[in-house]
A protein has these predicted regions:
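ASCE RecA-like P-loop NTPase motor cores
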Residues: 1-493
Length: 493
C-alpha cells in the first residue's frame, strides 16, 4: 500500500519532512526518494547493512582522531557496495515515512535507529564542517572496551545559516554577548552592533574576585591543582562563611560534574557539608533530569518558607543554561574555578583546529572566550530584573587577570571595584555583609524615576504628553468598596 500511494514516483510531502538538516538543504524535500530504498523491505535490508558497517568500525582498538564526512561516506559507499550515496541522505526521511505508514504510536522505542538514520543523513549531506571521531574506550577505564562514535559539528554557522537566508534582518540580543567580536566570525555574518548600558538606580550587584583563602593560600583551581587539598578546604570555608551571612538562596557552580563529585566528597569527610546544613539546606544537580527537577522544586520551597538553601550546580549544565534564581532564590552566586572545557577532548581538539584553519581564531582566545561566556551566564542567573540584587563571587585568582576580566559583560565589569580584584575569604565575607545590609531595604519607587523609570520630561519629550505630574507619577486611588456599584469596573479604570 505504501509503494502504491504517496511513494509511487512522488516527492516527499511536507508531512513526511523532519530530516535533521541543519540548514540550507530544504530543496532536498522536493527530490524523489531513491528507488533502492523505496520499498519497505529494501529499506530495512539497507539499514541492516548500515548497522553492520558501523559495528565493524567500532571493533577497532585505536582512536580515530578525526575523519571528515567525505572520507567516511566514501568508505561507507565502498564497503556497502552502494551505487551512490543518495540513499544515505534520504534514510532519515524514509524511516519517518515508514513509521507514519505503519501508524506507530510509540516512536520513542525507535530512537536508536532514528539516531543512525540521522547520522547517515548528515554524513551524506555535508562534506565540510563535520568530523567523525571514534573512541574505542573510556579514558578513565582504558582496559574495558566501550566504543563510542561521535559525529561532531565543528562549524556553528551551519546551525544559523537557514535563519540568515530566510530573514532579511536578524536581531541577536543577550546580556552575556561578550566579547562580541568572536560571534560574527564563528557564525559567519557581518554585524551591525549596538551596546546598551543597563540602567540601575543603585548598586544592586556586587561582583568580587576571591584570590586567597582565609589562610592566605592562593586559590587557583586549574586542572593540575584540582585535587589540591588546601584549595578544596579553602573553598569549603568560603562556602560555610557565605552561607552564614547570605539570606535565603545561594547557587554554587563547579567547572564539571567530576570536579563537583570530588569536592563534595572531600567536604563530606571534613564536615564542611555538616556546617553548611546548620545554615541552609543543600541540594545538588545531577545528570538525571528528573532528580534535578525535584531538587530545584525543593530548593525553592526551602527558600519560600525561610529555611534557606544552597544549590550545587555545574557550568554548562541544565541549571546554568536556563534556570533563573531571581529574587530570594539567588542572593549570591559563587563560581569555583573557571569553567574551561576539557582540553584533552578529541572533539574540542578537532573544533579548535577547524576554527584556527578557517577563521584564524587562536586556540587560547577561543577557550578563554568560551569559559568567560559560561561564567557570565552563571553570574547572570541571580539578576533577572532591575529590582533584584545579589552577590557575584568569582573564586579563582585567574579572574583578576586582565585577559579574563575584560571578557566579562560591561554591566558586570563596571561594578568590579579595584578593591574587589584581589580579595581574601575574610574580606569577601565582610564586604558581603556590608552590601546586603545596604541593598536589602526596599527602594522607594519615586527614587527610580529618571533612572530606571521614565520621568515626566521623558514621556512628554517622546510623545508630546502634557498631563499633570500627579497623574503620571502617582497611582489613581480606587474608590471605597461601598461606592462601587455595577459600574465598578468603569470606576476602577
Amino acid at each position: 500500500a505504501e509503494e502504491g500511494g504517496a511513494w509511487a514516483g512522488l516527492a516527499l510531502s511536507d508531512e513526511m519532512s523532519g530530516n535533521p538538516a541543519i540548514g540550507g538543504l530544504e530543496g532536498e524535500l522536493e527530490q524523489l526518494v531513491p528507488g533502492d530504498i523505496m520499498q519497505a523491505s529494501h529499506f530495512v535490508a539497507f539499514m541492516r547493512r548500515v548497522v553492520d558497517f558501523l559495528k565493524d568500525r567500532l571493533k577497532g582498538t585505536t582512536v580515530v582522531e578525526a575523519t571528515d564526512n567525505a572520507t567516511f561516506m566514501k568508505a561507507m559507499v565502498m564497503k556497502m557496495q552502494l551505487a551512490e550515496p543518495k540513499a544515505l541522505r534520504f534514510a532519515s526521511q524514509r524511516l519517518k515515512s515508514l513509521l507514519h505508514t505503519l501508524e506507530i504510536v510509540d516512536v520513542d522505542s525507535y530512537e536508536p535507529i532514528s539516531v543512525i538514520v540521522d547520522f547517515c543523513h548528515l554524513i551524506a549531506a555535508y562534506t565540510q564542517g563535520f568530523k567523525v571521531i571514534i573512541e574505542p574506550f573510556d579514558e578513565r577505564l582504558p582496559n574495558i572496551p566501550d566504543p563510542l562514535l561521535h559525529l561532531a559539528c565543528l562549524d556553528a554557522s551551519l546551525a544559523i545559516k537557514s535563519v540568515f537566508e530566510h530573514f532579511q534582518s536578524v536581531v541577536i540580543t543577550s546580556g552575556t554577548l561578550s566579547p562580541i567580536d568572536l560571534y560574527p566570525k564563528i557564525l559567519n555574518f557581518v554585524p551591525i552592533t549596538k551596546t546598551f548600558e543597563m540602567s540601575l538606580s543603585r548598586e544592586c550587584i556586587c561582583p568580587m574576585i576571591v584570590t586567597r583563602g582565609s589562610d592566605q593560600m592562593p586559590l587557583n583551581a586549574r586542572f593540575q591543582n584540582r585535587s589540591d587539598r588546601s584549595i578544596i578546604i579553602n573553598y569549603g570555608r568560603l562556602l560555610v562563611e557565605m552561607c552564614a551571612v547570605v539570606p535565603d538562596g545561594m547557587v554554587v557552580f563547579f567547572p564539571s560534574y567530576r570536579y563537583m563529585e570530588e569536592v563534595v566528597g572531600a567536604w563530606a569527610s571534613s564536615k564542611v557539608l555538616e556546617n553548611v546544613t546548620e545554615h541552609k539546606l543543600l541540594f545538588i544537580e545531577t545528570q538525571d533530569v528528573v532528580e534535578t527537577t525535584l531538587a530545584l522544586e525543593n530548593f525553592k520551597r526551602a527558600c519560600d518558607v525561610g529555611r534557606g538553601a544552597v544549590f550545587f550546580s555545574v557550568a554548562r549544565g541544565k541549571v546554568a543554561e536556563g534556570i533563573d534564581f531571581d529574587r530570594h532564590y539567588g542572593r549570591a552566586v559563587i563560581i569555583l574555578g573557571i569553567p574551561f572545557q576539557y582540553t584533552l577532548s578529541k572533539i574540542l581538539k578537532a573544533r579548535l583546529e577547524y576554527m584556527k584553519e578557517k577563521y584564524q581564531i587562536d586556540e587560547g582566545d577561543f577557550l578563554t572566550f568560551d569559559a568567560m561566556r559560561q561564567a557570565s551566564q552563571c553570574m547572570g542567573r541571580v539578576i533577572r530584573s532591575k529590582t533584584d540584587y545579589g552577590l557575584m563571587i568569582l573564586a579563582d585568582q585567574r579572574y583578576s587577570r586582565a585577559d579574563k576580566r575584560t571578557k566579562l559583560p560591561n554591566w558586570i565589569r563596571k561594578h568590579i571595584k579595584d578593591s574587589h580584584l584581589n580579595m581574601s575569604t575574610d574580606l569577601c565575607v565582610s564586604q558581603a555583609k556590608e552590601f546586603l545590609s545596604t541593598v536589602s531595604h526596599k527602594e522607594p519607587w519615586e527614587s527610580q524615576v529618571g533612572s530606571i523609570l521614565l520621568s515626566l520630561d521623558d514621556i512628554q519629550g517622546s510623545e508630546g504628553v502634557t498631563r499633570a505630574p500627579d497623574v503620571l507619577l502617582k497611582p489613581t486611588p480606587l474608590p471605597p468598596p461601598k461606592e462601587r456599584g455595577k459600574g465598578g469596573k468603569d470606576k476602577e479604570k
